[in-house]
Amino acid sequence: QSAEVTYSWSKAETKTSNALKLHNMAGTNILSPNKFMDDEWNFVDVTAGPYGNVYALTQTGLIYEYDNSGNLLFSFGGRAVSNDRYGLFTSATAIDLDEEGFVYVLDKERGFVQVFAPTEFAMLNHRAIYDLEKGNYVESKKIWQEILRLNGMSKIAHIGYGKSLLR
């Protein structure tokens, strides 16, 4: 867990909303229903990354990454139905990260760990969010511009770029 966020999740046998919670220092769940995907309830593991991001793993192998403000950054993974494919899981059971941002996911049924390397795009997003939160607006603005060059449809980049202009 990061010093800035505390996370918890409840494993449910039936569908429930807000199974994953992300608490700020005031104890408020910042994954409010309007920020959370209500259709996901089958979380099996959660871990925090080096920037305070939370990575949540579902039983179906979906991986969600939230920033420490509760915004969904990325989702990837999924269930392997009939054949083996990298990035898909038969029975995902655990998730962890190392200090370089590599994501490790255990597939219990297949008996191995898949490793996901952070992409340049993901690393740029992490750095831009970090710089913005630390008040490094000039540096953050440059990174947001690069992110928008790579993906002009990124909602988070548009919001981050706008915030960097408010210095």
Regions found by a protein language model. Name each.
Residues 166-167:
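Alpha-helical linker/edge segments of TPR/alpha-solenoid repeat scaffolds
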